[in-house]
A protein has these predicted regions:
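Membrane-interface helix-loop-helix regions
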Residues: 6, 53-126, 154-163
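Alpha-helical membrane-protein architecture signal
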Residues: 42-47, 88, 116, 127, ...
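Non-cytosolic membrane-interface motifs at loop->transmembrane helix junctions
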Residues: 5-12, 78-82, 170-179
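Interfacial transmembrane-helix boundary/kink motif in multi-pass membrane proteins
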Residues: 43-53, 79-88, 204-210
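Functionally critical transmembrane alpha-helices in membrane proteins and complexes, commonly lining
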Residues: 1-35, 51-58, 181
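Specific transmembrane alpha-helix
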Residues: 17-34, 121-137, 146-205, 210
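Membrane-helix interface linkers and caps
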Residues: 29-49, 72-80
């Protein structure tokens, strides 16, 4: 039955892609910035990340606001009674990627970004970027490996005790714990992979990847 449920999903699938996204982000951060800190300060790093990520955030929230009242469904119980001013407030806050409290839930799913649900992962992406820039970039590969090991243990414990690895999109203590646990191992594991693996060249790599 569960198998049939998942095979019937054409678009809404690939749940673990979020965790892969975190690992890929960690690898890319290491590739793009690990060797630049002698010529770059914290403010330069933040500007680069904002320029890269924030336009996508604003566009996602804007589209979510425009299409908000067209997604009427019984799975979104709060949508019909949400006034326009409240939706606009949530959209405006969403432009900054700051999470909204449960009191501003406009869909009924207690999301920190109800106009663009997946944006919770970008919020944690920013958290990881800040941790990297302020502290973890200074770790040696050995200490980074220790951090990744501990984060992996925390992730295993969460999966074992919770029974799954679902959560991270609500602004409360429990969901933030789940989100941070989901973030730490793959993101800094990706950074560690970059530091341990020497980049190589593949002939005609562009065409193979295409």
């Amino acid at each position: 039955r569960d198998f049939q449920f998942h095979t019937d999903q054409i678009i809404n699938h690939g749940y673990l892609s979020v965790d892969f996204f975190f690992m890929l982000s960690g690898f890319v951060i290491g590739y793009a910035y690990d060797d630049r800190w002698e010529k770059m300060n914290l403010w330069n790093f933040c500007k680069r990340r904002l320029v890269r990520l924030q336009p996508m955030v604003v566009m996602g929230m804007l589209l979510g606001g425009i299409l908000f009242y067209f997604q009427g469904s019984e799975i979104f119980p709060n949508l019909a009674q949400t006034p326009v001013w409240k939706m606009l407030l949530v959209m405006t806050v969403g432009f900054t990627l700051l999470p909204v409290p449960v009191s501003l839930d406009v869909r009924g799913w207690s999301e920190m970004h109800p106009l663009n649900g997946p944006a919770w992962s970008l919020f944690f992406e920013y958290v990881a970027n800040i941790l990297y820039a302020m502290l973890i970039r200074k770790f040696t590969s050995r200490w980074l490996a220790v951090l990744v090991f501990l984060a992996g243990c925390a992730l295993i414990h969460q999966c074992y005790t919770q029974g799954n690895n679902i959560g991270g999109w609500t602004l409360d203590a429990e969901q933030c714990r789940v989100g941070l646990t989901r973030l730490m191992f793959p993101f800094f594991g990706g950074l560690l992979l970059f530091r341990l693996c020497k980049p190589g060249r593949i002939r005609h790599g562009f065409w193979w990847c295409s």
